[in-house]
């Protein structure tokens, strides 16, 4: 049995399903390239049949990724499989992942078929996928609530049809570790041709068991773990990549000889990138990547750490690429110093625009005095999300709030190269007043669906990041703004979203013109 645990990352497929607004193709590619540097073996990057946008994303990522296998999901249907293959065909190496529900509840209530029908559909789907690639994965959806006899039967049939990986997912996070381990053990021992395929596991976290179930499965013979960065995913999320990887690495007394190809020093950086781009804050006490994961506030713990780090630290923060902050970046620091800090955090030159980052850094340093590594990181991420063709930009903003009176605001923006000013009175607070002014200037019909403020750093001069989701003509758009002033960061978030709307409208107009021709 192989000693390498295959890491199958599904952040861009299963993880993205949890987001309030879809990622752009550019953002998905940025994450995919980061996952490649992280060392994931397989990345599942979309469901091409679901939309033209998903097809484009899968195709774009497939074209750029060279060192990881690119995978796309499809139902056990010819159309799905053909479209997935079409999106993936430009890839250096690719996998088609096809699935069908196998639990009695799903078979009878959703599919309205017999289990015999389901087995035959699985066989035909695998055979169809094998026309395009010799790397085919088959999944038994809701295997956690499927009888073991039926799991073994359909797994054997799928392998015989040509599946090289068989996935036994706990789709609704129903299983406890002992149950799930037993399922994997029985599949290993009862399926006669199991030696011709890799057993994969895909666990959800509805009962908080995703990581435990995945690790128990490995102990019982599974050799692929399907997971996401930060555990993002539908409902309570998926198995967190960073948790299973670091558990295997840290507990070699249990997982003797087993390892992954993950470059663990990239974990912190990729975790932060996914959190920022997906607008999914990381809870402070999140294992491995939370801000408190390596914090020790108890006096007894601090004393022990000073004497010997191993007293309360089972892994080094440097192992996941977490560097200690330095307080020596000021407005007097040069470009080389900024680049040095970015290098120390693991960023490569093509991850960000140094000229733009340095200009933003100088503005922030003038306001804050000292600039921390996490400030640079936030500025770099925000810059990555800005479009090259922004029509709207913020110039001047002031707001005033007097007790028991509506808030007022003055906003000056540049729209298509022209400076436009607007005064707004009657706002329900300064942010509302500023938003009213911006919407009056742009004459944009927008519904605010989500507003979230996150502090980036510590103290009164911490950066405030505002993430919003707005709806315009039935579509959702994400905006993000960063500033030391909450009102300014809120304004920048709205302007970011409006620029996204302008670009979407421009694309729609171009498509409409092309069709009319």
UniProtKB/Swiss-Prot annotation:
Q: What does this protein do?
A: Catalyzes the condensation of the acetyl group of acetyl-CoA with 3-methyl-2-oxobutanoate (2-ketoisovalerate) to form 3-carboxy-3-hydroxy-4-methylpentanoate (2-isopropylmalate).
- From what superkingdom does this record's organism come? Bacteria
Q: Where is this region: Regulatory domain?
A: 393-517
Q: Which organism is it from?
A: Histophilus somni (strain 129Pt)
Descriptive protein name: 2-isopropylmalate synthase
Q: For binding Mn(2+), which residues are annotated in this chain's numbering?
A: 14, 202, 204, 238
What is the enzyme's main class? transferase
The protein's required cofactor(s) are namely: Mn(2+)
The places in or outside the cell where this protein is found are: Cytoplasm
Assembly description? Homodimer.
Stored PANTHER family? 2-ISOPROPYLMALATE SYNTHASE 1, CHLOROPLASTIC-RELATED, HOMOCITRATE SYNTHASE-RELATED
Name of the encoding gene: leuA
Give the main localization category.
Answer: cytoplasm
Q: Where's the Pyruvate carboxyltransferase domain?
A: 5-268
Q: Which GO terms describe its molecular function?
A: 2-isopropylmalate synthase activity; acetyl-CoA C-acetyltransferase activity; manganese ion binding
- Catalyses which reaction(s): 3-methyl-2-oxobutanoate + acetyl-CoA + H2O = (2S)-2-isopropylmalate + CoA + H(+)
Q: Which family does it belong to?
A: Belongs to the alpha-IPM synthase/homocitrate synthase family. LeuA type 1 subfamily.
What the entry lists under PROSITE patterns is as follows: AIPM_HOMOCIT_SYNTH_1, AIPM_HOMOCIT_SYNTH_2, PYR_CT
């Amino acid at each position: 049995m192989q000693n390498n645990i295959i890491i199958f990352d599904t952040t861009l497929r299963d993880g993205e399903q949890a987001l309030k607004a879809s990622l752009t193709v550019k953002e998905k590619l940025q994450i995919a390239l980061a996952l490649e540097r992280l060392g994931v073996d397989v990345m599942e990057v979309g469901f091409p049949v679901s939309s033209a946008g998903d097809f484009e994303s899968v195709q774009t990522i497939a074209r750029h990724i060279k060192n990881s296998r690119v995978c796309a999901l499809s139902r056990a249907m010819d159309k799905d499989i053909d479209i997935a293959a079409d999106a993936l065909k430009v890839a250096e190496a690719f996998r088609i992942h096809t699935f069908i529900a196998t639990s009695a509840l799903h078979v009878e209530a959703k599919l309205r078929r017999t289990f015999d029908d389901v087995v035959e559909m699985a066989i035909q789907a695998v055979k169809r996928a094998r026309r395009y690639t010799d790397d085919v994965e088959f999944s038994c959806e809701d295997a956690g609530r499927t009888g073991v006899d039926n799991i073994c039967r359909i797994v054997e049939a799928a392998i015989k049809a040509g599946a090289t990986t068989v996935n036994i997912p706990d789709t609704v996070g129903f299983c406890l570790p002992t149950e799930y381990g037993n399922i994997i053990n029985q599949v290993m021992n009862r399926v006669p041709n199991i030696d011709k395929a890799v057993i994969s596991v895909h666990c959800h976290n509805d009962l908080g068991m995703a990581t435990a179930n995945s690790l128990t499965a490995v102990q019982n013979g599974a050799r692929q773990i399907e997971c996401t960065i930060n555990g993002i995913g539908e409902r309570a999320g998926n198995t967190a990549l960073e948790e299973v990887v670091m558990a295997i690495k840290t507990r070699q007394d249990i997982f003797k000889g087993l390892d992954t190809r993950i470059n663990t020093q990239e974990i912190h950086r990729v975790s932060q990138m996914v959190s920022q781009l997906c607008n999914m804050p990381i809870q402070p006490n999140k294992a491995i990547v939370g801000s408190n994961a390596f914090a020790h506030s108890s006096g007894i713990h601090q004393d022990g750490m000073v004497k010997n780090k191993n007293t309360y630290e089972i892994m080094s923060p440097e192992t996941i690429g977490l560097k200690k902050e330095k307080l020596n970046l000021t407005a007097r620091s040069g470009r080389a110093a900024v680049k040095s800090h970015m290098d120390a955090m693991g960023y490569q030159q093509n991850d960000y625009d140094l000229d733009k980052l340095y200009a933003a850094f100088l503005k922030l340093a003038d306001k804050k005095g000292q600039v921390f590594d996490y400030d640079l990181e936030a500025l770099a991420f925000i810059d990555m999300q800005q479009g090259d063709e922004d029509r709207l930009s913020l110039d001047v903003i002031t707001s005033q709030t007097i007790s028991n009176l509506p808030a007022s605001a003055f906003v000056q923006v540049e729209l298509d190269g022209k400076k436009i000013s607007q005064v707004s009175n009657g706002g329900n607070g300064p942010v509302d007043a500023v938003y009213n002014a911006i919407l009056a200037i742009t004459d944009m019909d927008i519904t605010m669906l989500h507003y979230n403020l996150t502090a980036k750093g510590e103290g009164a001069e911490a950066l405030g990041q505002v993430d919003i989701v707005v709806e315009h003509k039935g579509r959702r758009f994400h905006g993000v703004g960063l500033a030391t002033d909450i009102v300014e960061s809120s304004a920048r978030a709205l302007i970011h979203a409006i620029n996204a709307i302008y670009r979407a409208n421009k694309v729609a107009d171009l498509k409409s013109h092309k069709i009319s021709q």
